[in-house]
């Protein structure tokens, strides 16, 4: 139900979990202190990212089809994060927590991922951001073309 089965793997640098049917939380993931890449795909019971903020070395976070996650607030504490993929994850409350992610270079939130508050302004304040991929939605503050132009200008 959490990351406790991995507790003795502190030297692990990359972890890809494909269809972890029992995973409900990120509790215990902090024991993977050298982890630089974490990918979770089709984690149908995972409903919170709380605990992920303990991964001080994490550079790449990929969430694919993790549809119960509504908040990305814990991601804000990942100071070395350069890539964040949140693809086909349903409804995300806001991307405002990313406003402090100064090292973030890539942010993909496409397919069914839908930012409920529609505020994409935080992307414009990220000094390292080079790539942002998302679907155009009527209530979003910016179109993909507007964000691309701002990032390349």
Question: Which residue ranges define each predicted feature?
Answer:
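Concave beta-strand-loop units of leucine-rich repeat
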Residues: 1-93, 97-153
């Amino acid at each position: 139900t959490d990351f406790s089965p991995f507790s003795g793997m502190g030297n692990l640098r990359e972890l890809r979990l494909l269809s972890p049917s029992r995973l409900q939380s990120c509790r215990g993931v902090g024991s993977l202190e050298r982890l630089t890449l974490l990918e979770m795909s089709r984690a149908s019971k995972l409903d919170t990212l709380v605990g992920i903020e303990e991964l001080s070395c994490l550079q790449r976070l990929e969430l694919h089809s993790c549809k119960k996650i509504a908040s990305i607030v814990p991601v804000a504490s990942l100071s070395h994060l350069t890539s964040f993929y949140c693809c086909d994850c349903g409804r995300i409350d806001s991307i405002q927590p990313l406003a402090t992610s100064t090292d973030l270079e890539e942010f993909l939130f496409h397919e069914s991922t839908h930012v409920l508050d529609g505020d994409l302004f935080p992307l414009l304040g990220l000094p390292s951001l080079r790539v942002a991929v998302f679907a155009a939605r009527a209530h979003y503050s910016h179109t993909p073309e507007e964000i691309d132009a701002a990032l390349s200008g």
